[in-house]
């Protein structure tokens, strides 16, 4: 498979719109159309993690924490971030981070920790400034598949539920 369908699944799970302003989640290194066979999942990306991905033949590393938080001014290998990015580039391994959007999603990291701790009566301390809206589209049955396959529809779809109705 290519990297893009994996990104699509991750972004349905934790929409990028839930990412904090300071965060840098998403595909950080690599091309969405790259063909891969395996994915390595880690909390952080380090040179050792890239080496492990390489040794098992993983073409994508999905990490919780992004290796790059601030834009890189150079790529010379002078620090751990640059060396790790360079190692991933050399090995042809994509790097994808799913950070605060996974923390903030209703069924994400924070919710899971609260459940594991047995907490009750949880509420959001600082609601997101941007709210998400759900949009439903109704089309004749014969046109449903082309609409589902349209790239704009795919980008806009976070949760798609299929409902069929009979004639009016």
Kindly give the residue locations of the regions a language model identified.
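Hydrophobic structural segments
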Residues: 1-168
């Amino acid at each position: 498979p290519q990297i893009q369908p994996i990104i699509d699944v991750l972004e349905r799970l934790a929409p990028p719109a839930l990412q904090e302003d300071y965060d840098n989640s998403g595909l950080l290194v690599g091309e969405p159309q790259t063909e891969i066979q395996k994915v390595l999942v880690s909390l952080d990306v380090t040179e050792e993690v890239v080496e492990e991905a390489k040794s098992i033949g993983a073409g994508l590393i999905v990490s919780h924490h992004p290796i790059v938080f601030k834009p890189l001014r150079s790529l010379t290998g002078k620090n751990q971030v640059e060396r790790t990015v360079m190692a991933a580039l050399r090995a042809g391994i994509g790097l994808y981070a799913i950070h605060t959007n996974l923390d903030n999603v209703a069924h994400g990291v924070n919710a899971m920790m609260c459940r594991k701790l047995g907490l009750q009566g949880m509420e959001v301390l600082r609601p997101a400034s941007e709210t998400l809206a759900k949009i439903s589209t109704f089309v004749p049955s014969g046109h449903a598949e082309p609409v589902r396959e349209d790239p704009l529809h795919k980008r806009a779809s976070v949760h798609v539920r299929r409902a069929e109705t009979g004639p009016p």
